Design a protein with these regions (language model features):
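Membrane-embedded helical hairpins/re-entrant loop segments and their flanking transmembrane helices
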Residues: 15, 41-79, 251-324
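Hydrophobic, membrane-embedded alpha-helices of multi-pass small-molecule transporters
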Residues: 16-28, 168-180, 197-198, 213, ...
Length: 437
């Protein structure tokens, strides 16, 4: 396949070229990796030390996961320049799980459900008629719509501000607005480097304004902690399990398996490799398998599920560098960043409105991606029915959770998430309506 690549998948770029390409990838993914743990920690009201450690371990786990994807071990890994990082898709179910059983239940449920994606990687061709693009589009749309609420809460000051009466003050909203407008401005700049780092620049400006307004509490920093190294400790917070959390998180693993398939396909195409035949199927299967395995590994090291980042496919196009060996540099950078507590500490002190201004836009793009997937399909009578019943029930539960207050605890815990309710409805409705026809 003819391409404009400077370095192909198996080429080994010189150190300088590889390092420069790796830095551009790092700019594109850094904020996306640390945002989920920051949002989850804020929602669960975790202290600075625990938040900092979770951020650091997200960077560490993302580095290890990226190395596995690029290197490939047996059937695990795509052997492409596939970058992995903490997934946004799991935030809603993880927060709901954390409210019930804390951090141990989060890690236990995420690890227990991770084999679902690994199994899907070996049986995906049999599930394609069940988890269709319409179904996956509906779930992605529901994920985005449910996360927008989380972003708005952060813009207002977070859950802590709701408790202490400082929610939605003019300072909080001004900080969030500055970040949002800055990200939009830099994203529309002609300079490609400003575009690539638009979120980082927006966060820096928001952080500066928050500091000037006295919103950054530096007293929470522990100097001794900052001077030390983060030693990854497997199962530091323990693990727990319940069925309802397993089902809610397991459903998202099904969707990330589909997303990973699309990401590996796009990466293969950009890298000038075939997107059909045995070699292609081996890459897709290995990529999805690694997605699940790496999410399990992330749980072991006190981090949240990982997924392949689609934005890095754009960086490959931009740089013309598809060499998987560049992934080794990226992996090393992420691991090193995760070992220094000061990185996690600086971002754990970030006020909620700063994060909210950036994540509001990110979550909106997740919802937009769901709309794009749905609209890529021909929407006939059957598809309209599936879409209508799934969104009605999914959004209904999300907007009015009290509708389940009289239901048994087992039912309430499973269907309290709009993503789970809407996703399961989409799968069942898609099967039933197709059978009826």
């Amino acid at each position: 396949m003819k391409t404009d690549l400077i370095y192909g998948v198996e080429d080994r770029p010189p150190f300088k070229d590889a390092l420069f390409a790796a830095l551009q990838h790092l700019l594109a993914i850094f904020v996306a990796i640390i945002t989920p743990p920051l949002i989850i920690a804020s929602a669960l009201k975790l202290d600075v030390e625990k938040t900092s450690f979770l951020v650091s371990m997200s960077l560490f786990a993302s580095g290890v996961s990226t190395f596995i994807q690029c290197r490939r071990f047996g059937v695990i890994g795509a052997r492409l320049l596939c970058i992995q990082g903490t997934s946004f898709s799991f935030i809603g179910p993880i927060i709901a799980t954390g409210m019930v059983g804390g951090v141990p239940l989060i890690f236990g449920s995420c690890m227990a459900a991770a084999p679902i994606e690994m199994i899907v990687s070996r049986t995906f061709k049999y599930l394609r008629n069940i988890i269709t693009p319409l179904v996956s589009g509906i779930v992605v749309l529901l994920i985005g719509l449910s996360l927008i609420k989380v972003g708005i809460v952060s813009c207002g000051g977070g859950y802590a501000a709701m408790d202490n009466g400082t929610f939605a003050t003019w300072e909080n909203l001004s900080i969030a607005a500055l970040v949002l407008l800055s990200v939009l401005f830099f994203n529309r700049c002609g300079n490609k480097y400003l575009r690539m780092s638009s979120i980082v620049l927006g966060l820096c400006l928001g952080y500066g304004l928050a500091f000037a307004l006295g919103k950054v509490d530096m007293s929470a920093l522990n100097v001794e902690m900052l001077m030390s190294f983060n030693i990854p400790q497997p199962f530091k917070y323990g693990v727990d399990f319940n069925v309802s959390s397993f089902i809610a998180i397991g459903l998202v693993y099904l969707i990330t398996a589909i997303e990973a398939t699309g990401d590996v396909t796009a990466n293969s195409m950009i890298s000038g490799l075939p997107i059909e035949g045995d070699s292609y199927l081996k890459r897709v299967s290995g990529g999805v398998m690694a997605d699940g395995f790496n999410s399990f590994l992330a749980g072991v090291f006190n981090s949240f599920p990982n997924s392949i980042f689609a934005q890095n496919n754009g960086i490959i196009q931009l740089t013309g560098v598809a060499s998987r060996y560049v992934g080794y540099y990226i992996a090393a950078m992420l691991v090193l960043l995760g070992l220094f507590p000061i990185v996690g500490a600086v971002f754990s002190l970030m006020p909620d409105p700063v994060l909210g201004g950036a994540t509001l836009l990110m979550f909106g793009t997740v919802a937009a991606a769901g709309i794009r997937i749905v609209s890529s399909q021909e929407i006939g009578r059957k598809e309209t029915l599936v879409l209508a019943v799934s969104l009605s029930l999914g959004l209904g539960v999300e907007l009015m959770p009290d509708v389940l207050q009289q239901a048994p605890e087992a039912i309430r815990s499973i269907f309290s998430s709009g993503i789970t309710t809407g996703g399961l409805t989409a799968i069942i409705a898609n099967i039933v309506i197709r059978v009826k026809e």
